[in-house]
Amino acid sequence: MATLEAARKQIAPVSFDDAPQLRVLTCGSVDDGKSTLLGRLLFDIHAVLEDQLQALDSESRRWGTQGAGRDYALLLDGLSAEREQGITIDVAYRYFSTRRRSFIMADTPGHEQYTRNMATGASQADLAIILIDARRGVLPQTRRHAFIAATLGVRHAVLAINKMDLAGFSEARFDEIVAQFASAAQALGLRSVVAVPLCARDGDNVATRSDRMGWYAGPTLLEHLETVDVASDAQDISGFRLPVQLVARPDAEFRGYAGTIAGGAVRPGDEIVALPSAKRARIARIVTADGDRPEAGEGDAVTLTLDREIDIARGDVLAAAASAPEPVAKLTATLLWMADESLLIGRDYALHLGPATASARIESIHHAVDVETYAPRPATWLALNELGSVTIALDRKLVAAPYRDVRALGAFILVDRVTRQTVALGVVDALPLAATAPTATSVRPTQILRPARWALPLAAGAAMAALAGLLTHDPATTATLGLANVLVFAVARRIENLLA
């Protein structure tokens, strides 16, 4: 312990705003030590001021869970409910720098009921620190968090096996947990996974090497975070893309289109196409807070003016004319369902994809994901915190892209139209080739049975399916889907019709 404290004092505090940035997420099951780890890391790199330490000591005596010692988790858990219950509820962000790198750390909750908050933190992360309690090993919530992080584009992970003191600093236990997670890491497609044994409370292998685990020859957590290469994860986008967030009209002489460039680069004179209208123009100016620029690229917030006026609204996408994508009205996506009421086929929601919005209908559920094995399993609905693959039909065409290719055009949320609650987070997996707006299926009754078609809306369940089989050459489910698009049924009955 004395060696750890002496080593910590040799770490000088720094603040380099121009250092390369790494966005880090901590995740894992409840009570695995996520907040304690980040708090201890902040302490070890001298990112905690003296008055903050005094306040921490006072709060530790009142709220702490470490007896007479400091409770470093309180540096992150700021809500009164978090301190009273000793848990993390909301996402806490911390910003700090070392000589090598600047960091944005997102401390996320481990409780299953706050999974939506964890997903929020994962949506912008480059690397995930997956905490595991050395006594309990890999839990279902550990696997769920790892899957969500990977689904949201995180390609690098640290397997932080914490509370090694409670496992006797056992190398065998460390190796056992690493082996438990190995199959999951392979299934998730992670590019790098580094396992580090820790005692976050005491600082072992956090920022300084532990003398209590001499068998471990790898880097400390901080050493790995400072050196991990995430530059190779940059998106490879063929052509310029800018979702329009605002049409700027400060006066009668200026009309510009503001947004953050999602990919590619743009220069004055470049030909662009506005989607979905397909109107063309050329870039006249690239305006920023620092004045006009000769060029702008991915991640730059700009306002573009054009050489002629065309109809462009918030939610449209400006794209390079030579590589413009095709707007679509159907998506295949992975959803994280975040509402108490289950997701059902046929339900309508408001879809928000960046600044663009559309009415969306769940057309089909392909499968749910088993969080234990990551294998698909049959499903007709998704319950709270379940993940699954679905097809979504839109009422109008939007510009979208697979999330793995363009994050800004591949992530969306679904909102309940009545409660205005966000009910799902989704990422686009694929764009079907025949992506057209949903329409009612054409039903072709025979001349003899034509009068009977008016009885169809009054039937339900198996009766609906049987009648549909008589009245059309199409499969019963196809017929009922078309009718459900144009007839006003109770939600439960419409779902019954589709599943009959």
Where are these regions (language model features)?
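Canonical P-loop GTPase G-domain recognition
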Residues: 167-233
